[in-house]
Amino acid sequence: MKKFDKLGLDNIKEIFHNLSYDELNAHEKANNEGLSTDNDTFCVDTGIFTGRSPKDKYFVKQDPSSKYIAWGKVNQPITKELFDKLLTKAKQELSGKKIYVQDVFCGASLQSRKAVRFVTEIAWQAHFVKNMFIRPSQEELENFKADFIVYNACKCINEDYKQDGLNSEVFVIFNVEENIAVIGGTWYGGEMKKGIFSMMNYWLPLENKLSMHCSANVGEKDDVALFFGLSGTGKTTLSTDPKRRLIGDDEHGWDDEGVFNFEGGCYAKTINLNPEHEPEIYGAIKRNALLENVVLRADKSVDYADASKTENTRVSYPIEHIENHEPSLKAGHPKNIIFLSADAFGILPPVSKLSKEQAMYYFLSGYTAKVAGTERGITEPQATFSACFGEPFMPLHPTVYARLLGEKIEKHEVNVYLVNTGWSGGSYSVGKRMSIKATRACINAILDGSITKCEFENFEVFDLAIPKALEGVESVLLNPINTWLDKNAYIATRDKLAHMFIQNFKRYEDVKEGIEFSKFGPKI
């Protein structure tokens, strides 16, 4: 117990330190924390919070970190005094209890990884952490020294939030100087995963290493590909390829040695999961995996179509559950980078080759367009711009990440492409979704290098290089103007989308890099 004195908890009844999967499973059942499915996968409910609470995320504003953090709606400031008050409250919640302590690594690169200790009173949260992060060897556990500690006091709420000037009784706070995070009021597992991701996005760029919200895989010739894209663009589906080993599906770093996964597991959406379309994910859901917010039938089988608790049903599992993964969780420098956008306006080409400067522009734009599946009366697509394809998790100014990406693209001569997995032949009410077959053909041409042998033409207004012909893709699809029956509607929609890009990019023009990169976007 003595080695845990530094945690600052009083009268701890018992500490369960680095339990095995079987031990965690036994605790989950004994604590009545959830149910087991028909194939012995444990299944939990995360309560009223079935997603992250971005409005309740704060960074302590103090030097020296305050001069690096890009303060605003994403990175909200909180005082050291208020942090201390809420940390004390969280520690009181965890005191006098039996607690679970889980030690893990974030980052598969020995020179870049961070050692993180999680403290919680809920067994399934320790299980989630064990699934999602890199599991140290026995020897590494014996010599484990935490770089960062997360106190997850999910049962603790802040009743004084109004007088404290906060948004709700929930709080997720990061203290960069003291290397501590504290979570209160939300049970959602993703807060722990994305919280440490946010910290990696603070630490690594200051060491001149790039942190990225992307998936990554590696081919038989050790050629690495990165896939960036917001939710719903096909990032997980397209990076899962029987001919290529999965490095990771969500969070990666890029240092002098190459690309490495931050995680040791995957956190996949399960809504409408179909074993025919996504056999790897379906097959990964077995003992040691952890299902969240799904609905069980009477026979304990999972009804993946049931969204009555949330659309955001999830499963976490160790990456070993994916047969075709890269065991080292790392590889060399990328050969190809693919930006995925599901353009519901039907304007972006199925595939375009980007210059280094255009890559900076589209990386900073982080564009996709969503269709309103849940809101009635909305017929217009909704443009979404998320800096670096992961704005909620980026504590530094987005141009910091863009500059690093540009330097690495140049140094390692990486090819960069923009792939539209969205609509063709019109916006989403008129046109149709790009077929997965056509998108796969574009991806395959990028990965096998055949696209580099194509003849390219210029795509007007956006000034993109698009192939005139590509094996496996109907030529008519390659330039969107050819797929629209109403050419006037096409021109009007194209100019409207270009204007959205231009307007969005103005927010980066507070720094000189932003002004420089703005020259490489659309021009009306």
Swiss-Prot record:
Chief localisation class: cytoplasm
Xref: Gene3D superfamilies: 3.90.228.20, Phosphoenolpyruvate Carboxykinase, domain 1, Phosphoenolpyruvate Carboxykinase, domain 2
Protein residues bound to Mn(2+): 194, 213, 250
Pfam families: PEPCK_ATP (PF01293)
Keywords of the record: ATP-binding, Cytoplasm, Decarboxylase, Gluconeogenesis, Lyase, Manganese, Metal-binding, Nucleotide-binding
Needed cofactors: Mn(2+)
Function comment: Involved in the gluconeogenesis. Catalyzes the conversion of oxaloacetate (OAA) to phosphoenolpyruvate (PEP) through direct phosphoryl transfer between the nucleoside triphosphate and OAA.
Descriptive protein name: Phosphoenolpyruvate carboxykinase (ATP)
Lineage, broadest ranks: Bacteria, Pseudomonadati, Campylobacterota, Epsilonproteobacteria, Campylobacterales
